[in-house]
């Protein structure tokens, strides 16, 4: 068996290197593809019954420590024919496991499931370990039930697309269940030689991207299901794809040591980050949201994070629960000024208390007020001070990143004055216990290139610049135990 924990696959064939297309890290962005990485549902009674079964079990879960997400191979282990049920009970019953298998599932359908309830455990009920096995159906399914939605799948589905779909699901696990360690399984071999080769290629791509054993581990059991000549061991399969009792026994034995290790490991403690602001923080859409890019930047740098807040949407009226590309929780409030935030933040902190807060505030005040610059900026700063006081009252060790605001066309002088006062505030209000540090996205922000059509919201380029500034400040701030860093080897 092969565990890819801290050791990536360094010897990848030239074919696989070409399919990686610049992807070097588990947390790199995943290209959107209708065939493998765009969430989609199946509209038939069976699929929906299983989807809602899992949602009910998750909602009712009490001390569930282990979950399995997959397709019919996973489903059959405890819910199908009796081939694997005894093994399931003997190996995993003590963990009160939930079987999240659903027959026929392909990666875009599984993305729909994990972003629409299958991972919505109550606070305090998140499992310790999750096991993910999927991908094989991407090589066999061409359309949903009844042909309502066509997917470009089947034998021509590239291994890189399958790998991307699996990694997308894995990313959802880590974002939605940050305290749950994940075991990513290599896709098991099948009888068809061509598909078996593609399974190996897809698995090699993901094995090369899983670089630590603190949060995610990659387990490759493919060779355990093959004969010495490389052909399928038919004694382990009922039909060339699904497993016999002995096949399930091999799977259980292969992951048992890692499950035990993860169960006994110290709990993962993500840093809770609250992004506080107005329209700039909420964002016009996903592309123009700095939150999207900041999430990936921090994770690629090894930070174990969890964005927190009461909101999960942009101003385009599209809620974000289907979005697996970043953690969507925030406290950006469209059209609200600093006075509104100062008044309402204590209420919002009743549900979420962050370890780190990032404040970008003042843009709405400047856009909506004709007051003199001096009095206007003084008022904004007073409200920011109230936010800082409210945050410190909830968490005496909080780290606060206070940001200059990005340029506002036609309001350059008042923006400059506010940013000067923000800088001075930071210098005089940071303490050893409750650090306040400055982030300056205004510097280097080009209004001719980085602002969207809706002044002063950033476009994608501007949002990336903001995210880079905030991520760098958080990365370089002495968090004194506020953050855990994953053990990553490059």
What do these predicted regions represent?
Residues 1-9:
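Bacterial N-terminal signal peptides that target proteins for export
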Residues 8-18:
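Bacterial N-terminal signal peptides
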Residues 27-168, 195-200, 280-382, 411-416, ...:
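Conserved SGNH/GDSL esterase-like catalytic core that processes O-acyl groups on lipids
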Residues 63-65, 94-96, 125-130, 177-181, ...:
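Loop/turn elements at helix/coil->beta-strand transitions in domains of secreted/extracellular proteins
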Residues 91-99, 117-129, 141-143, 152-183, ...:
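Preference for well-ordered, secondary-structure-rich cores of eukaryotic proteins
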Residues 115, 135, 171-178, 211, ...:
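Sec-exported extracytoplasmic/periplasmic mature domains
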Residues 133-139, 145-148, 170-204, 225-228, ...:
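Active-site segments of SGNH/GDSL-like serine hydrolases
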Residues 189-267, 323-328, 333, 406-490:
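Catalytic His-Asp segment of secreted/periplasmic serine-dependent ester chemistry enzymes
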């Amino acid at each position: 068996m092969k565990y890819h924990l801290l050791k990536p696959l360094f010897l990848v064939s030239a074919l696989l290197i070409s399919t990686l297309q610049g992807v070097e890290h588990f947390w790199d962005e995943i290209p959107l593809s209708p065939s493998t990485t765009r969430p989609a549902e199946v509209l038939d009674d069976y699929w929906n019954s299983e989807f809602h079964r899992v949602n009910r079990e998750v909602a009712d879960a009490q001390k569930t420590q282990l979950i399995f997400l997959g397709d019919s191979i996973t489903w059959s282990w405890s819910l199908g024919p009796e081939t694997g049920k005894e093994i399931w009970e003997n190996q995993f019953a003590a963990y009160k496991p939930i079987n999240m298998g659903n027959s026929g599932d392909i990666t875009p359908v599984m993305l729909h499931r994990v972003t629409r309830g299958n991972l919505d455990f109550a606070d305090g009920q998140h499992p310790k370990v999750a096991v993910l096995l999927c991908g094989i159906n991407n090589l066999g399914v061409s359309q949903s039930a009844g042909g309502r939605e066509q997917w470009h799948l089947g034998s021509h589905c590239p291994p890189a697309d399958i790998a991307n779909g699996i990694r997308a699901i894995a990313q959802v696990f880590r974002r939605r269940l940050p305290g749950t360690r994940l075991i990513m399984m290599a896709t098991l071999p099948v009888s068809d030689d061509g598909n078996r080769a593609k399974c190996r290629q897809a698995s090699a791509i993901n094995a090369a991207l899983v670089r630590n054993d603190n949060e995610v581990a990659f387990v490759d059991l493919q060779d355990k299901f093959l004969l010495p000549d490389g052909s399928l061991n038919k004694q382990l399969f009922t039909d060339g794809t699904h497993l016999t009792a002995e096949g399930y026994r091999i799977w259980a034995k292969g992951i048992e040591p890692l499950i035990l290790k993860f169960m006994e490991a110290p709990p993962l403690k993500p840093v809770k980050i609250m992004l506080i602001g107005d329209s700039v923080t909420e964002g016009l859409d996903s592309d123009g949201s700095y939150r999207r890019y900041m999430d990936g930047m921090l994770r690629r740098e090894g930070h174990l994070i969890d964005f927190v807040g009461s909101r999960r949407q942009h101003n385009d009226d599209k809620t974000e629960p289907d979005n697996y590309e970043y953690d969507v929780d925030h406290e950006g409030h469209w059209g609200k000024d600093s006075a509104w935030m100062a008044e309402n933040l204590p209420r919002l902190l009743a549900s979420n208390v962050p370890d780190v807060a990032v404040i970008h505030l003042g843009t709405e005040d400047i856009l909506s007020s004709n007051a003199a610059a001096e009095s206007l900026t003084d008022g904004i700063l007073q409200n920011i001070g109230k936010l800082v006081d409210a945050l410190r009252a909830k968490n005496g060790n909080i780290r606060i990143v206070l940001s200059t605001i990005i340029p506002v066309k036609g309001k350059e002088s008042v923006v400059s004055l506010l940013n000067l006062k923000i800088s001075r505030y930071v210098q005089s209000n940071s303490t050893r216990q409750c650090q306040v540090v400055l982030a300056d996205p205004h510097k280097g922000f080009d209004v001719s290139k980085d602002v969207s059509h809706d002044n002063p919201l950033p476009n994608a380029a501007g949002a990336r610049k903001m995210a880079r500034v905030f991520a760098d400040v958080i990365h370089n701030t002495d968090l004194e135990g506020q953050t855990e860093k994953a053990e990553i080897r490059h």
